[in-house]
Amino acid sequence: EINIGDWSSDVCSSDLQDPTAYGEDWGKPGSICELLDKLNKVPGLEWIRIMYAYPERITDDFIAAMKRNEKVVPYLDLPIQHCNDTILKNMNRRSNRAELLEVIGKLRREIPGITLRTTLIAGFPGETEEQFEDLCNFVKEVKFDRLGCFAYSAEENTVAAKMDGQIDQETKDRRAELVMQIQTGIMAQKQAEKVGQTVHVLCDGIDEESGLYLCRTTGDAPEVDGNVCVSSEEPLYPGQFYDVLVEDSDLYDLYGTVVK
């Protein structure tokens, strides 16, 4: 996501689903760091958001590039899917549990206040109750800022669809719901902690029904995360930035007024 004035665009194209792999197609892995350095110098550009980053590609150089370029917002979506080593191997993922914890810890140490989002899958073929419990404990330990969990759904002609140990739909749904219940408690606490803070937001527009302006912080990606719902007697303009005092919260959204 790139924001320049009143213009915003998702620049992560289908051939760049993992921005951290930028440059590998022409034999220059790690070129994302150089790209961020160049984008950071573009006049008028306010925010650069890296939407997806696979943990195994998050290097020290990549973290350093995020830190030194002030226009790169402290936000990453880490599509980890699971944490149990056996399940990760069966998913053909490259990271294991220890490596996931290491990269998450490093990101939080090096970039204080970074927002971390992830998506998990419950009920992958062969997932035992013990492995699912491992996933639940991982969610409790890491306390992601944003998290979605979905029941595994078999796709035709995939390796996973042909695996032994397919799990019934009721069990898959129950497991996904349990993960989201854990995350609900984490989210409620994180949201409540923001009340009383002043946050810098980008205005996306107005909700005609409520009359509230829909804005986002650096921790809110478009379409997938929540809003900062702002009441203002003066008009707010899409693409412009404002400071907002957070006065209330719910599970996904914050509510506040513009600081004058």
Please place each PLM-identified region on the residue numbering.
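Conserved SAM/AdoMet-binding glycine-rich loop
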Residues: 10-130, 140
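Terminal RNA-binding accessory module
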Residues: 162-260
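Short, ordered loop/turn segments at secondary-structure junctions
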Residues: 17-19, 152, 233
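Single conserved hydrophobic/aromatic residue that forms the stacking wall/gate
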Residues: 1-11
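Hydrophobic, well-ordered secondary-structure elements that form the walls
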Residues: 78, 119, 139, 147, ...
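Short beta-alpha junctions and helix-cap segments that line functional grooves
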Residues: 62-63, 135, 230-231
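C-terminal, non-catalytic macromolecule-binding modules
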Residues: 130, 136-173, 179
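Short acidic/polar active-site loop segments enriched in Thr and Asp
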Residues: 9-10, 46, 145, 150, ...
